[in-house]
Design a protein with these regions (language model features):
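Catalytic domains that recognize anionic headgroups
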Residues: 1-346
Length: 346
């Protein structure tokens, strides 16, 4: 089981990359998975715990180290079931060391491909025949945004928001590089393992804004589609190929799905619902969830709140309702007729 996180990749740009289209043809692609928290630490801990931030302990930027001891996360569960586990991260505090045989981090601007290729090789060698779980964090988009964009433009610099096309063009170059990495790392994985028994999941933790909303230069400030709508691509011998679904899902659905795919039962309840049957048997019209929830509290911007979430939204396949706690304002959008969320109909 290999997770490949393409940090900051937007679901609505996947169509610009031939590399990603090629990968997409090899598996089942879900392009409407709502990130319960649209920034990396919060997002990944929801994915691995199957719990919302309020339940796993990490629901704010300031609570990076607050993962509850009373819960179990995916690497712990897999390790208890005989897996050798490893990860490479942008920062060693993104996920807890709990459940990892190898827990490492890379520096900003590192050679992600070489580092991840070496980690894969090391993991399979050290596993000595055990099944392997590896989490690879590709952070190019994050690195460039944090190191180049944020220092150059303050959140209230109007010039940034007035050059949306230029911002998106710059983003697309980074996105294409991320997809090129994804294709290359897939080849490395294929060369090392028995593809019959391997599941690869390419995923995004959140999208990256390009100046669509005043006050958000990257992500984590609001809960609009460009940052909370994410994608998951499942590839494996037992997974159907050339399937695409835009039915609504949530990141709390990922853990039960992965456990189902691994044939692992747990003795505790999870709020999400597995969609493993869709991956293996075929997409149905009614699969998915009726409602998905997302929340955030920004580090900067118009309504910074790093100590607790202060922007909340609930969405269906048709509508999204957002509550901005700090100014006490509501927004309602018709996602079918206004997918860019331009007209507040509240």
């Amino acid at each position: 089981m290999i997770f490949v996180l393409l940090d900051g990749c937007r679901w609505d740009r996947t169509n610009i990359s031939n590399d990603f289209k090629e990968l997409q043809s090899e598996g089942t692609f879900f392009n409407n998975v709502t990130a319960a928290i649209p920034y990396t630490a919060g997002a990944v801990n929801v994915i691995f715990s199957g719990l919302y931030g309020k339940d796993n302990g990490i629901d704010a930027y300031s609570k990076l180290l607050a993962l509850k001891k009373s819960i179990k996360v995916l690497p712990e569960i897999l390790q208890e079931n005989g897996y050798f586990t490893s990860c490479d991260l942008i920062h060693d505090k993104i996920v807890s060391k709990r459940g990892y045989d190898i827990h490492q981090a890379h520096k900003s601007g590192a050679d992600y491909f070489s580092i991840h290729s070496e980690l894969l090789k090391k993991s399979f060698e050290m596993a000595s025949g055990k099944p392997v779980f590896t989490f690879l964090h590709h952070s190019l988009i994050h690195d460039v945004v944090v190191n180049e964009i944020l220092p150059k433009y303050e959140y209230d610099d109007k010039s940034y928001y007035e050059q949306k096309e230029q911002n998106l063009a710059r983003y697309d170059k980074l996105f294409l590089e991320a997809c090129s990495y994804a294709k290359k790392i897939k080849k490395v994985i294929d060369s090392m393992v028995n593809s019959r028994d391997t599941i690869i999941i390419f995923l995004s933790d959140h999208g990256t804004a390009s100046g669509e909303r005043f006050g958000e230069r990257n992500y984590g400030s609001y809960t609009y589609e460009e940052t909370i709508r994410t994608f998951y691509l499942f590839i494996g011998q037992k997974i159907l190929k050339k399937q695409t679904s835009d039915n609504l899902l949530s990141t709390i659905d990922i853990l039960p799905t992965v456990l189902d795919l691994c044939g692992i039962n747990v003795n505790f309840k999870l709020p999400g619902k597995s969609f493993a049957d869709v991956i293996k048997e075929g997409i149905t019209k009614n699969h998915g969830t009726k409602y998905a929830f997302s929340e955030t509290g920004a580090l900067h911007g118009l309504y910074p709140s790093p100590e607790k979430p202060n922007v909340f939204c609930i969405k269906t396949s048709k509508y999204k309702l957002i509550y901005f706690e700090t100014p006490n304002e509501w927004s309602l959008f018709d996602l079918e007729n206004d997918p860019l969320e331009q007209k507040n109909i509240f």
